[in-house]
Structure formats: C-alpha cells, structure tokens
Amino acid sequence: PIIRPSHTITAPTIGLGDTRPRPQAANCKHRCIYKRSFSRFSISLIPDFHYLCVMQKTTRYIQKSLEGIYPPEEIRAMTRLIWEDACGFSPVDVILRKDTVLDESLRKKIEVIVEKLLQQEPIQYILGHAYFAGERFKVGPGVLIPRPETEELTLLIMRENKNRQLRKIADIGTGSGCIAITLSRHFHDCRIEGWDISPEALCIATENNQNLGASVSFLQRDILQYTPHAEELYTYDLIVSNPPYIVPSEMAGMEPHVLDYEPHTALFVPENDPLLFYRAIARVGKKLLCKGGKLYFEINPIFARDMSEMLFSEGYCDVRTDNDLFGRQRFASATR
C-alpha cells in the first residue's frame, strides 16, 4: 500500500547525532558536521532514484548517495533525520514497513534533500531546525547553527547557578535564541533578555520563543556601540555570550558547509583583535552586573590564556576556564 506520514514523531534530543571533532580544527564553530570536501562531485554518480519507491531501497539510495562524502555514522544520523524529521516516519516504521511503497511527493522530497546534502548544505538548514537541550529550534541561513559545546555552556550555567536567586540575565549575541530560551525555561522567575545586532536572527529567535512557550525579551543592540542606560546599571545577575571568535587565518582548516552557508558575522573576528567582542562585553558587564554577578563565555581555545588575562585586567575576580567534552578550553567565567 502507499502510505503517508500520519503521526507526530518524537524528535531526537540532540542535533545531528554528535558533531565530530576534526584534529586540525580547534573550534566547534569550524564544523557542524564532519565532511570531506568535494569541490566537483558528479551528480551522475548518484543512484537512479525513480525505481527506488520502496522504503528499504530508499534508505539504501540515501546512504549510497552520501557514501564517500560523509563518515558512516553521520550518514546513519542523516538517514534517520530524513525519515523522521522530513518524512514523519519513526525508526520503527522504517524497519517494520521496509517494503512499503512511498508516494511520489515523499520520493521527490528525499531526492531534493539528498541533492542539497551533496552540495554540502547543512542538514539543519535543509530541514529548517536544529536540536538544542532536547528542544527543536528553528534555524536558517543568517543564523548560526547551535553546537553541542554551546549546550554544554548552558548546562554549566544552570548547574552552577541552581541555588542563586537570579533576577535578570542577558544573552549577548543570541542568534537563534537557544541559550536564552533554554535558560528561561529553567529559571522561571528570572527576566531574560536576548541581544543581537541582526534583525533576521531576532526574528527567528522570537519565533522560537513563541513556539517553545518561553518568555525571553529580544532586543536589537550592537554591543560594540552600546552604552547602558541609567536604569540598567548593576541590575543583571548574569551575562552569557557566545560571540564570534574565529580569526581569518583559521579559515583554511574549516569545512565548506560552514564557510559557504553559515553567517560570517557570527563566526569571524579581526585577525589583529580576536578578543574584540569579549572585551566589549566585559566592559559593559562591569556596568550592568550587580556585585557578585557572573559572566560566562564560549571561547576559542587558542585564546584561553588571553581571555583570562583580559578578564583580570578588566577588574573581574574568580576568573577560570573550563574544558568541553573534547578536552579543549572552551568556556570562560568570571565574577564582578
């Protein structure tokens, strides 16, 4: 029989499986999904899809098409997401209904997704969403795809501040709003703001806020030009930021799916001033944070020592760095 998805699937709790680290890539923003780069990939190598109308054969088509471009574990994860998120079939459906005939609209949808993956477009942009802290966030070109390391930072904040009475938090450079919204759903009695310079990012963040039932206030602000208002002084308990931190000299080690699709304004800083955004946030933080207020950053590991020195020089105490799951100095924190 020909079937169509008729149920709401249960979404995976993380993004596209685990994003795989590359030994030559120092930063999580260098990658989203591990891929080998093929600047000229012949579409003629893709199996003919028109006769692959049975679910089991369609799975083979997806995996064979992506073979040699993605590692096997990523191909399996992508296949699962294509079936589950794009087509509405659970892993159990795919197994139990392996001989089921798909309708033409689903076959066409899968063909289009595979073609985009062969052009190295991130699957999160293709599907229109990514997973963060167990929730589904809308993403698209112009908004950085959330990384697992950023989720680590958010969990670190929740763990370290679970016994504090937080009244006000700012997420500077909020992007899709994933940090701010996740914190809002955890710290229920706290006013949380998400700042960004990009109207496009703020639009997506606002939509995520509504979809997830959060209560974040999103504000368009340029942290490099921002002067706190009198009523804001010393009223924030916590500031968090995952600002741009990659220098142009690192571009050679980055994957095309990041360089060609994700917003450079969310990735790169000047070669001669890699702490540009951190310094600006630290200085604004001295005016916004109350006494004992906390500052949290996701950082570039190669500038971890410079970050610590900068925070000390700006008058912060309890400065420290923490490693991510891959053992890199990925997070910095300090107390006003």
Spell out what each predicted region is.
Residues 44, 50-51:
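Short, positively charged and aromatic/hydrophobic N-terminal segments
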Residues 55-127:
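N-terminal auxiliary segments of SAM/dcSAM-dependent transferases
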Residues 111-207, 333:
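SAM-dependent Rossmann-like transferase core, predominantly class I methyltransferases
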Residues 22-23, 42:
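Short polybasic linear motifs
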Residues 189-191, 195-336:
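S-adenosylmethionine
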Residues 26-30:
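Short, charge-rich patches within N-terminal targeting peptides
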Residues 1-10, 17:
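N-terminal helix-forming leader/targeting segments
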